[in-house]
Amino acid sequence: MSLNKKLALIIIDGLGIGKKDDTNAVYLANPKTLNYLIKNYPTLEISAAQQPIGLLENQAGNSEIGHLTIGAGRIILNDNANINSYTKRLDYESLVLNDINNEIVHVVGMYSNGLVHSNYEHIHWIIKELVKNNNQVVLHLISDGRDDYPYGFAQFIEQINALKTQYNVIIKSLSGRYFAMDRDQRWERTQKAFNTMFIKQDKICEQSLLEVAQSIANHYESDEFVEPIVFNNDEKYNLKPYQKVILTNYRSDRMRQLAHLLKPNRKFNYHNPFLIKDIHLITLVPFPDVDAITLFEKQNLNNTLGDVLNDHHIKQARVAETEKYGHISFFFDGGINKHYASKTQYLIPSQKVATYDLCPQMSASLITKTIIDHYFDHDVFIVNYANPDMVGHSGNMKQTIQAILSVDSEIQKLYDFFKKNNGVLMITGDHGNAETMIDANGQIITSHSINDVWFIITDNNIVFDQTQKFSLANIAPTILEYLNIKKPIEMAASSMIKKIHK
């Protein structure tokens, strides 16, 4: 099937709708192209957080659930909610954990209530289950500072110390997520975290966990950047062959590199010089390309937007830079690596900088160039521009403004090119971030927001339904109606289109 009009779904990561004041980098940037499109084309404000996309009240959206929901065309049970449906049951017992007896078990996870990559309550649950069978838990903590308050880790120390006392947990190490959860193949970061966690170190931290947490603000920009440190250097708590390691983060994209260092997989070519063989790796949910035992199964999503386009032989292109590549492929396709005959994926390398506020333009221009260069090769483009989110996470207002302006400039190029060639853009965000940079107390915010996002279509023949509130789940049905394709029954959400003028 060949389309009369080329269509591009442009997902501007972290671009939400906020207050028109100096806490909002989007407002301060005053992006002329986006402003023009919002004013001159059909536009809706749609939900990208909380219950409308299957999250909890006051829970911010994130890139994983955002792309998952956009691609699925329905509200889905996210990993956190799915896991909670088991762990909150008093009668639930894990067969995997019940089979672990009288062992030293390493537990690794981000202790955070950001609920983007992890939930600290899952760490509690796993520890409680393990100690029932006389296991010794060795805990490796990862601090957040990105999906939570910049220095929010200190608030958890009392809880963590209670775990230590009540369950005789060994607090072995602490690492900022910058190191332990890199996803851009900066292997020196992941290796540093691995070595600190599992390999004997010459230097041990003399401070208590509380003292370290209280001093983070004096040494680091946020909890995210805490250098990996060891609290216990006892040889018997270093990782050894045949021992078990449980990764408690449920989101895979920022755990796969650490998983690779524990148990090499075909995804990466990097070799761990300190590889410990025959490790038994356990994850909460299945991770792509990772050989691990899983505690919980993922929800199986069929008939996603990618499936339907492929079934109709519509040539689709996925374009993003490294930081968000997994989102427009793995997550967009329902949390599965699907290889469609009709799909071409373009991976644009992210800039090799320590943090993206040092390069707010990121690789946006190469994304645009790739789309334009391959315009006539495909029918539908699924695109992610990462700048507002990745730079917004730095908390640097000035550079976040530059990030937004960089993307705005690229949108102008795409708009001009698509208009000239009778193509159409659909523009949205996957969640908010850059529009809420400072809180009511004047503190920097580096985390996502619960704000709405725009949905714009550059076709004035479209009339949107203004009588109800829509969400990210309505995007796929809208695309299918625009393409005159019947949506599958699994897509429970409706189209946002009221009428198409011929």
Curated annotation (Swiss-Prot):
Gene3D superfamilies: Alkaline Phosphatase, subunit A, BPG-independent phosphoglycerate mutase, domain B. Its EC number is 5.4.2.12. Binds 2 manganese ions per subunit. Mn(2+) 1 binds at residues 389, 393, 448. InterPro entries: Alkaline_phosphatase_core_sf, BPG-indep_PGM_N, Metalloenzyme, PGAM_B_sf, Pgm_bpd_ind. Pathway: Carbohydrate degradation; glycolysis; pyruvate from D-glyceraldehyde 3-phosphate: step 3/5. The active site is at 63 (phosphoserine intermediate). GO terms for biological process: glucose catabolic process; glycolytic process. CDD domains: iPGM. Catalyzes the interconversion of 2-phosphoglycerate and 3-phosphoglycerate. Belongs to the BPG-independent phosphoglycerate mutase family. This is 2,3-bisphosphoglycerate-independent phosphoglycerate mutase.
